[in-house]
A protein has these predicted regions:
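Cell-envelope/extracellular polymer assembly enzymes that use nucleotide-activated donors
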Residues: 6-8, 39, 187
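Short, well-formed alpha-helical segments that are part of the catalytic scaffolds
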Residues: 16-31
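Acidic helix N-cap motif at the loop->helix transition within catalytic regions
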Residues: 18-22, 49-58, 99, 103
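Glycine-rich, basic loop-to-helix element that forms the pyrophosphate-binding segment
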Residues: 70-86
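Donor-binding/catalytic cores of nucleotide-activated saccharide
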Residues: 75, 96-203, 208-228
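Short aromatic/hydrophobic "clamp" motif used to bind/position activated sugar donors
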Residues: 91
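C-terminal subregions of glycosyltransferases and related glycan-biosynthesis enzymes
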Residues: 204-272
């Protein structure tokens, strides 16, 4: 029987030799008061650089780290693989080029199974080291706010789409990431919130540090065409779901509107 842990941190890694070690060590530092009750699952997504060796070295050094490998199938597939391997009561996603840091007050008792989803702060860090709170202009939800149904958090709100902004109770996480597309978080997060139970917004666990890099998949102009096409695909899939499930449509309207706005912004940005 597999031991049930508190949190499974899923770290997809593709050609991440320059950032993987910093990412993993940030998790270890953050969880220092909860040692041996968590795991870090590095999913090597067919890396062609030194990532596999670094991952194995970290696993040999840190007992909470395990490594699984797959052929290069993309971020969504790597996250799905990690979910299948996870043993934690909760699942947290941390991209290999990002980090986390402990909050001033850490209260792991929040992770007692009472909440299906916990929304945590995201700090955007630029390449010059400037920081800002990600999503602060669209969220406006006080920490400690609870929702009996996660879809009430989604309603009338342009929720942060990043799956890394939430901890997900593994047993209730029914949605999987759509593979082979960019912006897979947009669909995953909406569908997970629609079907999730209790949700709380908290700053008493840890903060996710989203480190902006000019060469990342979601910012590089080289991928603009595919990103636009994939946003359109996601909008189409969500609208199809909304049409088939009218009882859910009212919870999706605001997010769908913002997705359309984002699509138009991207077109104007890259197709002037």
């Amino acid at each position: 029987m597999r031991k049930t842990l508190l949190i499974s941190f899923i770290v997809p890694a593709f050609n991440a030799q320059s950032t993987l070690t910093g990412c993993v060590r940030s998790i270890v530092r953050t969880m220092s008061s909860c040692r041996s009750n968590y795991e870090i699952i590095i999913v090597d997504d067919g890396s062609a650089d030194d990532t596999p060796r670094l991952a194995q070295s970290l696993a040999e050094e840190i007992e909470e780290v395990t490594v699984v490998t797959q052929e290069n199938r993309g971020l969504g597939a790597a996250r799905n693989h990690g979910i299948d391997e996870a043993n934690g009561l909760y699942v947290a996603f941390v991209d290999a080029d990002d980090e986390i840091k402990a909050s001033g007050i850490v209260d792991f008792s929040l992770l007692n199974g009472s909440f299906d989803i916990l929304c945590i702060p995201i700090l955007r860090v630029t390449s010059k080291g400037k920081t800002s709170v990600y999503g602060s202009t669209t969220q406006r939800i006080p920490f400690g706010k609870r929702f009996d149904e996660a879809r009430d958090y989604l309603r009338h709100r342009n929720v942060i789409p990043c799956a890394c902004a939430y901890l997900w109770r593994r047993e209730t996480l029914l949605t999987r990431f759509h593979e082979d597309i960019y912006h897979e978080d947009e669909e995953f997060t909406v569908m997970s919130l629609l079907h999730g139970g209790t949700l709380i917004c908290t700053n008493q666990l840890f903060t996710y540090k989203y480190i902006c890099r000019p060469d990342s998949i979601t910012t590089s102009s080289e991928n603009a065409g595919k990103r636009l096409a994939d946003i359109a695909t996601i909008i189409g899939r969500l609208e199809t779901y909304a049409s088939a499930h009218p009882e859910q449509k009212r919870y999706m309207r605001t997010k769908l509107l913002w997705l359309h706005i984002d699509y138009l912004r991207q077109r104007l940005r890259y197709h002037r």
